[in-house]
Amino acid sequence: MEFLTNEKLVIVGAGGMIGSNMVQSVLMLGLTPNVCLYDIYEPGVHGVFDEIQQCAFPGANVTYTVDPKEAFTGAKYIISSGGAPRKDGMTREDLLKGNCKIAAEFGDNIKKYCPDVEHVVVIFNPADVT
């Protein structure tokens, strides 16, 4: 399989629904073979990793981690759907407040570990304010 680049791409929130779908899309489209799945929830990201290992993506080098330093170091591309989902009884403002903290940590990780990143795509809830 031919890829558009060999640079590292990190998928943040890879254990969630959007993130796990992005992994498959990235590999099916041949964007890069070097994909790191990152999520703070180890059982979720490990499950997605196991699923991807069962797929036929020749030449893919997929890794996973719950360590931000390992995930972000050397990344040139980042897709993040790592915001928290809305829970019962939460207002949009509650969700925004919680996801602002997550977004700040996300930005800090980029600054610390991959300041030369080329492209970052962020999808957080509430989606109309990110």
Predicted regions and their residues:
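Conserved glycine-rich cofactor-binding loop
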Residues: G15
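Short glycine-/small-residue-rich Rossmann-like dinucleotide-binding loops
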Residues: G82-G83, N125
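Aromatic pocket-lining residues of Rossmann-like dinucleotide-binding sites
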Residues: V26
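Redox-cofactor binding/interface segments in oxidoreductases and associated redox assembly factors
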Residues: I79-S80, V122
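Rossmann-like NAD(P)(H) cofactor-binding subdomain of soluble oxidoreductases
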Residues: T91-T130
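Conserved N-terminal Rossmann-fold NAD(P) cofactor-binding segment
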Residues: N6, L31-A75, A84
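Conserved hydrophobic helix-helix packing surfaces used for dimerization/oligomerization
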Residues: K8-L9, V120
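N-terminal Rossmann-fold NAD(P) dinucleotide-binding loop
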Residues: G19-S20
